[in-house]
């Protein structure tokens, strides 16, 4: 298992909230919780930035963190990420903040400690481009957006 450095930004993590953790032994994502003083209401169509109370430093250039929505929040309540996906670069050292967007028809209340998103770590391959005049032809070619249906 890879070790990632985490810094506690908000001391309530020790007393009232938890560090991100896997819900099950087969979980791909670590649950991120809302580090709030009091419940926060997100009205339909609105977004809010929510603190997690922690910062991470991945440091390994071959790994990135990805913040993803929790499927149940999106399906049941219309709560998704305001930026759809949050990408955490290996050299970022700031606090993890989650942008929640209520795309549902009803207000949604985020309670302190509520699991609001998940953090997944992924391998990264950095590339460099080689400029060419043409590509070797393939069966698909340049056809996109629904061409392979």
Curated annotation (Swiss-Prot):
Q: Where along this sequence does the record place binding of substrate?
A: 70-72, 83, 87-89
The EC number on file is 3.6.1.23
Cofactor(s) demanded = Mg(2+)
SUPFAM superfamilies from the xrefs? dUTPase-like
Query: Sorted alphabetically, which InterPro entries does this protein's record hold?
Result: dUTPase (IPR008181), dUTPase-like (IPR029054), dUTPase-like_sf (IPR036157), dUTPase_trimeric (IPR033704)
Tell me the route in metabolism or biology where this protein functions.
Pyrimidine metabolism; dUMP biosynthesis; dUMP from dCTP (dUTP route): step 2/2
Keywords (A to Z) from UniProt: Hydrolase, Magnesium, Metal-binding, Nucleotide metabolism
Name of a matching Pfam family: dUTPase
Task: Cite the GO molecular-function annotations of the record.
Answer: dUTP diphosphatase activity; magnesium ion binding
Q: Which reaction does it catalyse?
A: dUTP + H2O = dUMP + diphosphate + H(+)
Query: Which GO terms of type biological process are on file?
Result: dUMP biosynthetic process; dUTP catabolic process
- Family note: Belongs to the dUTPase family.
Q: What does this protein do?
A: This enzyme is involved in nucleotide metabolism: it produces dUMP, the immediate precursor of thymidine nucleotides and it decreases the intracellular concentration of dUTP so that uracil cannot be incorporated into DNA.
This protein is called: Deoxyuridine 5'-triphosphate nucleotidohydrolase
Which species expresses this protein natively? Blochmanniella pennsylvanica (strain BPEN)
């Amino acid at each position: 298992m890879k070790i990632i450095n985490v810094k506690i930004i908000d001391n309530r993590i020790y007393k009232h909230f938890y560090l991100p953790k896997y819900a099950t032994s087969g979980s791909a994502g670590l649950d991120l919780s809302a580090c709030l003083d009091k419940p926060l209401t997100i009205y339909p169509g609105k977004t809010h930035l929510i603190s997690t109370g922690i910062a991470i430093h991945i440091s390994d250039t071959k790994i990135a963190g990805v913040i993803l929505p929790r499927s149940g929040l999106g399906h049941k309540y219309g709560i998704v990420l305001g930026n759809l996906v949050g990408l955490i670069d290996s050299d970022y050292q700031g606090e993890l903040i989650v942008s929640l967007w209520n795309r549902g028809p009803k207000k949604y209340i985020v309670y302190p400690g509520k699991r609001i998103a998940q953090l997944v770590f992924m391998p990264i391959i950095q590339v460099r481009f080689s400029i060419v005049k043409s590509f070797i032809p393939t069966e698909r070619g340049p056809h996109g957006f629904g061409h392979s249906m």
